[in-house]
Structure formats: structure tokens, C-alpha cells
Amino acid sequence: MKGYDGCFVLRCMLANSARWRPKIISNGLKLISIQCDDIRFIDSLSFIPSSLSVFPKTFNFPESKGYFPFLFNTSENQNYEGHLPALEYFCTDQMSTKERQNLLDWHATQNNSVFKMSEEIVKYCLMDVKILVKGCIQFRSMFMDQNKVDPFEESTTIASGCNKVFRRLFLKENTIGLIPKGGYRRADKQSKVAIQWLRWVEHSQQVAIQHAGKAREFRIPEGIKVDGYCVETNTVYEFLGCYWHGCEECFPNQANVDPKLDINTAMFVRNENTVARSQRLRKHGYNLVEMRECDFKRLMLVNEELRDFIHNLGDQDEEPLNPRDAFYGGRTNASKLYHKCDGISEKIMYYDVCSLYPYVNKYCKYPIGHPKIHVGLECKNISLDTVEGLIKCRVLPPSDLYHPVLPLKMHGKLMFLLCRTCGVELNEGECGHSEAERSFVGTFVADELRKAIANNYKVLDVFEIWEYEMEVYDKATKQGGLFSGYIDSFLKLKQECSGWPSHCTTDAEKKKYIEDYYEKEGILLDENNIKKNPGLRYLAKLMLNSFWGKFGQRENLPQTSIVSEPKDLFKLFTDPLVQVQTINPINDDVVLVSWDRPEGEGENLKTINVSIAAYTTAHARLELYSYLEKLGRRVLYYDTDSVIFVAKPGDWKPTCGDFLGSYIDEFVSAGPKNYSYNVFSTSDNALKSTCKVKGITLNYKNSRVINFETMKDMVLSNSKDSLYVYNDRKIVRDKSYNVISRPESKQYRISYSKRRRIENFDTLPFGYKE
């Protein structure tokens, strides 16, 4: 449906939109769902992210998708009956090398078969539908049996389905807080000078006041929202802006009316409302302290201590901490662009952390509840050695760290650098900048910041801290952990459905296997359930890997409205909380309007807690860094949960089972997610190449153009040239959801800008100097 199937359904409905009245959820032009009253169209790929051809193997049924000569499907051939069409009609160039070979083997056995177009096209389409239906029914049945949740009825993606399962079956009370829209501080609009006065009162009188500068404005039980409130003394603090409260001294003509507002904005009305509000607060028994804006400004002129205090507030009255600023992705880059083993004892090894994110979800600590907010000067009393939570601060990196610790978003990428200015300028030379130019401001998870400090980062200023209580799994007692119940449930299912390991052939070996697994994971396997079940294993793996990302989803996602009435379009344009992005005509009666809301105005979803998402990715980066730190300059490449490195006898290596790349001989990379290597296959006794390039499908045709040799030639020669791959018949949808076929070309070139290049194909972080 995301591809183009949904386009046919939608355009048919839009031809008679008054009858169908479809509502759509989309991601750009990709259709996620179409709903018409009680009928809902959803995408199986949103739940089962695999090709239809692997459904039979995954869900263990006998049908096979088979092959069809798509290019033979022309009007001239609709009544064709004869020999099987030639290979050129089967789009063999668009297949992987393995798929292509399977097709060649099959085609060679069909010499005597008769191909009747009118029957074969129906048979192929029916088999597609049959496989899809059987796979989806089995998936839904397994999901409901295991989770008591109907994925297709109660969610639109596997991620939302996982979140629903967690909240229904595993979420403990009072553990995950819903972060208020706009955060905890300065979300209530209050003038900067009002915050300064409230902070001065806190400082000079040593009282704790709740106000918008560090949390939300307090609403007293009588329903009145006040500027500040001290619980201990039952005191309300009100800052009276002269303009908004009708100050008689500053506005002696009390009949003045703001021409942009209504008659009720006359100064005397504002003054009377202020007096009445003050009387009401006192009547309710509150101590009331008021400060007029003009009085406070006069006080600042004569009170030097107050002026110094306001000056020293500094950046705490700037933008509040945004937890999304601490939500960085995985760490991906090449630290050396080419390496060939010396042919004697050196090897290139590929280490992959098995199930990194499920491991993090189970064993690592997570924030619970709502944080205590510390701002500005308050942060000086907080120890960075022990505080848990998110920290907004200015840091100065060391100048000689080969693998920097802290991330920084720059140039649309996640960078790890030692000088902010070198990063901005992409300076390929040695850094000559001052400390002020090298330092940068960021928001970090406390654990990642502590790791940075241990690697000689200096914290120059701390602007704000969200201090959380933590929940963590105890390996000794096998108790606790925010997500351990969820992870254990599906880890158990996955392990049981994998069957017995090959070395478990006797009852004693099976018993020891169960005991060892319990000792390691705290999960007691049921020997009666240990049998191969590829469908359930696939489901368990999906539930483990698709779980955590929902916590970091953006709240303000683009929305699409189907508009057939001019008044509805005008309403969208005049709504101050709507930002229209695009308008695409569908026909004479209907347009599609894509829109979103201003920053901070999105819906506060109950499935989202960005602090949890930030902790998840920070823990994953720290796990990867534990290997980078020890491997040092032997690292060639890393990507979120894997690392490729050089090893000689006696060198430190991560503890693990068999290495995927124990016999890698030669490695080359042209940038992040852009690498290739030659590996010796012991099973085939031959040298094989693996090549990965983000954004380009390396099918049979494209792999003739982009492969180990061409990538190596470009890197070794530092080529500025480009390679191009072509697809003569790319099926796409346009902005009006028409499905068309058109030629497509993609450009490939060396793109390396996350570190600076030096001799011998090595690299250094921007800002590095000995």
C-alpha cells in the first residue's frame, strides 16, 4: 500500500468522494491507512516488513510466489499461448544475484511447458493474494494469542502494536510520565522580567517558589493560575506588568484602549480586574506578594546586588531544555577508508552486538516519573558524578581524542568532533581555534556526559538539569527494570521457537542448556515449547526490535486532508494553528491539502516519552563506545551495533562467539553506510565480496557498476567522478497519487565529511591536534 497499491484504491474513492468520504494517514506520499466509515485499508508491510516471496517459509505453508514475465504483459500478448517467454521478460536485472540464479535454474527446467498468458496472469495474481492472506491471518492469529491485542484493529504499524502490548500487559503504574506539551519550564508564557523577579525573591528570601521559569505556573485549588506559589508559606506571588494590568502611574489616562483589542482592554478595566483578583486571592486565605513592573525596574537601578544577580542568571532564561535535543541516533562512520591485511598474521574482523536494543531495554537504567527541574545557579549544587537525567550544558572537548564521545547535530548529520568551529567549516587542517570557538552547547544523557568527562571533556556551564529517578534491572535478584517483563516475554518466545541447539542431543545436555540460559538471562525456558517455529520466532524478533522507537516519535506529524468544499479550504488557511504545506489537485472537485501545526502545538500523545528514547540510544552508543575505546585506531568502521577492526595475535578483541568476518582480507569505505570488503568463505573455499551502499539497491545490474573493485578504485584514487545506475522502468506515484512508470537514475560518488582525511586513508575527528 505504501508503494502504489493504495493509490488505485484512493483515486477510485476520490472519484466519488462524497460517497466514500475517505480519511487518510500518510507519511509524505506514502499511504499508511485509508478509512471510510467502518472500512479500513492498512499496509501489511507496516506489520510484516518482508517481501511476499518469503511469507511461505516464514509462516510455514507450501505455496510459492513463483515467477512471472512482467515485461511480457503488453496488449499484444494478452492472448499469447506458446513457449515460456525468454529470460529478458522476467526483469532479471532487478533481482539480487541469488534470486537471479534461482530464476535461471527454474527457467532451464521449463523448456517443455506451455505458457498461456490469460491463465498465467490470473494464476500469479491469485497466488499473490493467497500468500498475502494466509500470511496475514497467521500473523494476526499468533499476535493475538501471544498478546491479547488485535494488531490490525488496534494499530497501524508494528511499532504502535508493540506499544499497545506493553501498555496493556507490562506497564507498571506511575512509571512513565507524559512530558507536558512545551516541556516543564517556560511552557506557560510569562515575561522574562517576571521570571527574573521570582528568581530574585527565591534567592534573596531563600524560599522555593513554583513558577514558569522552572516548571509550570501553579493553579491554586480555587482554579486561579498564579505567577508563583510557595507551598511552605501559602504565599502567592504576582508580577503586574504595567501595560497588561493598567498601572495608574505608567498609564495615567485610564480611558485609553488598545486599538488592536476590544473595549474591555481599557486601562481602567485592566486595573479594576487586577484589584478584584488580588482581593479574591486574599479572601481565599493566601498571603499575597505583588510587584509592579515599574517598581521592579526602579529597584534594579538602585540595588547593585539585584543587578549582579540578574546578570549572572545568564543562559538559564534562554531556551529551556528540550528532551528531543538529547535524542541522537546511532553512531555510524568509517574511521579508515581502506585497509588490506599484511598477509601474515593480520585479520580484519567484523563484530556484531547481538540484539543491542533489546539488551539495552532490559539491562540498562531508565528514567521514571516526572523530573525535578534545576535551572542556572541551582545546577551548581548538583553533582554531575551522581545526578541522573538530562543535562543541558556547554562542553569543551579535549583536542587529542581519536574517538570523541559526545554527539552533535551538524550539516544534517550526527557528528562526533573536538571543535565546533572546525566542524562548521569542515576544516581539513589542524585546529587553531580558541576554547570559546571549540566548545559547544548540547543536551545529553547524564551517563554519556560522565563518560565524556572521564575522557577529559570539560563542562564549562550547566544551564538546566532534568533530574529523574531511575529504574534498573538487578542481575543478582533478576528483578526490576522498566522493560524487563516485556523483553523477557518475547526473548523467551524467540529462544524456544529457535529449537534446540545442535549440541543438545541428550536429556542431560538439554537440561544444562535450560539451566545455563536461566543463569545468563533470568529466563526459564519450557522444554516442551522448545521446537522450531519460524513464524512465532519471526513475531518474537519483531516484537523485540520494533518496541522502543515509538517513545521517540515526533508529535507534530504532517497530516493530509481531502477537501471538496471551498469553505473547508478557507478554514484551513485561516486557522492560526494550521500551517498548510502543499495543495495537490486530484480532479475538478477534490484537492489534497498537506498541513502540520506550529512547533509545540502538536497533540500530546500518550505513547511518547522522548527522555526514554534518548536514554535508549545513549545506552546503545555507550555500548558501542566501550569497544571503540579499547580498539582505538584499529577500528575501520562502525555502525550502531557493529564494528569492523584490525586484529593481530595478542591484540585485545571483544569476547564473543564466531566472528562473521574472521577471514576478511581487504576493506574499503567511501563514507557512512557505504562500504565493501572481501571475505574468504571457508565453506566455498573462495573469496567473496560484500558491498553495502545506502540508497542504492545493489541488484544484479547495479552490482555490475558498484562493487568492491569500483569502490576501491574511487577511494584509492580519491576520485571526484560519479558512477550512475539506471532503472528503465521505475514504478512511482506522483503528488496526485497517479501511478506511473518512468526511467530513474541514481548517482554514486565518494561522500566523506564526518571526519577529516589524512595520509594512509586514515581519518581524524574535526578539531584533532596532538
Whereabouts are the PLM-identified features?
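Active-site metal-binding core of divalent-cation-utilizing nuclease and nuclease-like domains
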Residues: 200-236
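Basic, amphipathic alpha-helical patches used to engage nucleic acids or provide basic targeting signals
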Residues: 232-292
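Conserved acidic
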Residues: 1-208, 266-277, 282-289, 298-770
